[in-house]
């Protein structure tokens, strides 16, 4: 028999609502969706909506779901709360969490009752929207209304904490939950193990695995995948392979996610041949590689200038019906640009729009850098203009890439215009930006202007780094200003920045 949860739950809520700083927020104060237009689709009788919920709900689009909701609230007698729960759950699976919250509020206004199931759906939507303060506030409301939280309720909250990088709060709630007499299931353990692994706390995750097994809960493929991914991310390659052996001995077989984690680790460590071996092992096990598998392998091949093989892999994935996304395209375009085959990259860039793949900031930035390195600045600037025209927002890396290209080619005035535009658009320059400008000015012999930029850094709230000092000192030396360069060297050491090998 579980002990009453009210006192412990309330103390937990108080602690966490204070943390989030939003204890008084109600669901409706943060979420409202205006302007939903419900088309009045004709339903011949009350059984039609039940037929839709029973057989057609998996294939429904959002508009159809909204039409169905509108019809259901018009029915007399009203459909059961179980029917409403089924519909809300389906919309939640579409990841339209804000819509679920809105519809739940409409149900409240219409006096449609709720149960634990509908409450759990709403609470999960708050967590998925990263609105943990609202989720905790709503948990308090649930308890007041007499709905005792279930293991599903806690699962949603734990997932919300882990997704919000609040794994310690997740562990605290886990302990409170166990203290109240709830028995965690494999899903609960998996949620926290995954959160710990993503927070680089793999040893704690392994401890929790031991605790899980002592509690008589057997790990599944999801448990092992989280641990293998965490071990790989922490560079513990041998531990990861041992974990694979361990799961296989228990007759828990690796899936596509497992192999993707191993391939990712191999590629990051430069062990592309081993990554290919894992890929071949997948094929032997009759596992279909997914877009992540292919993208990782293409990245590894491009990294080692094996472009012909990367192209072949790209073509092969398409032939298998696995169509590349923006990430895959960007990887291969980057491979071409780094191998000085920027025109091949441009061809792929054009192919993206033909295939309906939307280019993102990374794609544009890669191509701009490719043309800058090829000395084709006019093309790079044109791509930048097209990017802005298409509504794709340049980030600081995009600006720095373009500025680097302009400064390297002696176009300092144009670089300063771009810098001014960037600041006008609300983008704050970072120390890398100013290092690029200082380097460009020094290279062009405009050391006095570079010095002015250097002196303005404090006013911009920026601290010079090793590259700022290095570049500025080189510029001063080249101008014969040795005394000024030596003074700057001393200033650098006073600031606690150690000289690199170029200046020792």
Swiss-Prot record:
Pfam families: PPR, PPR_2. This is Pentatricopeptide repeat-containing protein At5g16640, mitochondrial. PPR repeats lie at residues 45-79, 80-114, 115-149, 150-184, 185-219, 220-254, 255-289, 290-324, 325-359, 360-394, 395-429, 430-464, 465-499. GO terms for cellular component: mitochondrion. It comes from Arabidopsis thaliana (Mouse-ear cress). It is found in: Mitochondrion. Keywords: Mitochondrion, Repeat, Transit peptide. Residues 1-43 form a transit peptide. Belongs to the PPR family. P subfamily. It comes from the Eukaryota.
């Amino acid at each position: 028999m579980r002990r009453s949860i009210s006192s412990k739950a309330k103390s937990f809520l108080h602690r966490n609502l204070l943390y989030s700083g939003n204890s008084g927020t109600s669901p409706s104060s943060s979420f409202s969706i205006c302007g939903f237009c419900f088309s009045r689709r004709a339903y011949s009788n009350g059984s039609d909506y039940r037929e839709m919920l029973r057989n057609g709900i998996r294939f429904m689009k959002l508009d159809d779901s909204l039409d169905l909701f509108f019809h259901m609230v018009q029915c007399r007698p009203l459909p059961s709360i179980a029917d409403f729960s089924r519909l809300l759950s389906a919309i939640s699976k579409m990841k339209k969490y804000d819509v679920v919250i809105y519809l739940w509020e409409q149900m409240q206004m219409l006096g449609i009752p709720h149960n634990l199931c509908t409450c759990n759906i709403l609470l999960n939507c708050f967590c998925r929207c990263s609105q943990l303060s609202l989720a905790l506030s709503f948990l308090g409301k649930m308890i007041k209304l007499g709905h005792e939280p279930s293991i599903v309720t806690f699962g949603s909250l734990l997932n919300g904490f882990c997704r919000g990088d609040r794994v310690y709060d997740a562990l605290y709630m886990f302990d409170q939950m166990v203290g109240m007499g709830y028995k965690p299931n494999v899903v609960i353990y998996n949620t926290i193990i995954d959160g710990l692994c993503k927070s680089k706390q793999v040893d704690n995750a392994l401890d929790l695995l031991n605790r899980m097994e002592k509690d008589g809960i057997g790990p599944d493929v999801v448990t092992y995948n989280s641990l293998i991914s965490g071990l790989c991310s922490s560079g513990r390659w041998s531990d990861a392979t041992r974990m694979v052996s361990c799961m296989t001995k228990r007759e828990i077989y690796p899936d596509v996610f497992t192999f993707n984690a191993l391939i990712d680790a191999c590629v990051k460590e430069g062990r592309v041949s081993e990554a290919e071996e894992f890929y071949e092992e997948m094929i032997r096990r009759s596992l279909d590689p997914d877009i992540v598998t292919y993208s990782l392998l293409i990245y590894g091949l491009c990294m080692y200038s094996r472009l012909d093989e990367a192209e072949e892999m790209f073509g092969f994935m398409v032939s298998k019906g696995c169509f590349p996304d923006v990430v895959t395209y960007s990887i291969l375009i980057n491979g071409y640009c780094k191998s000085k085959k920027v025109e091949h990259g441009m061809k792929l860039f054009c192919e993206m729009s033909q295939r309906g793949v939307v280019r993102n900031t990374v794609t544009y930035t890669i191509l701009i850098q490719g043309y800058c390195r090829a000395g084709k600045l006019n093309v790079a600037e044109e791509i930048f203009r097209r990017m802005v025209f298409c509504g794709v927002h340049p980030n600081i890396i995009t600006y720095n890439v373009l500025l680097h290209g302009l400064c390297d080619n002696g176009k300092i005035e144009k670089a300063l215009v771009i810098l001014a535009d960037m600041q006008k658009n609300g983008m704050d320059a970072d120390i890398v930006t100013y290092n690029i400008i200082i380097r460009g000015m020094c290279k062009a012999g405009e050391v006095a202007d570079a010095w002015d930029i250097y002196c303005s850094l404090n006013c911009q709230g920026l601290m010079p780094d090793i590259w700022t000092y290095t570049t500025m000192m080189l510029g001063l030396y080249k101008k014969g200003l040795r005394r000024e360069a030596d003074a700057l060297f001393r200033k650098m050491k006073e600031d606690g920045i150690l000289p690199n090998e170029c200046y020792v």
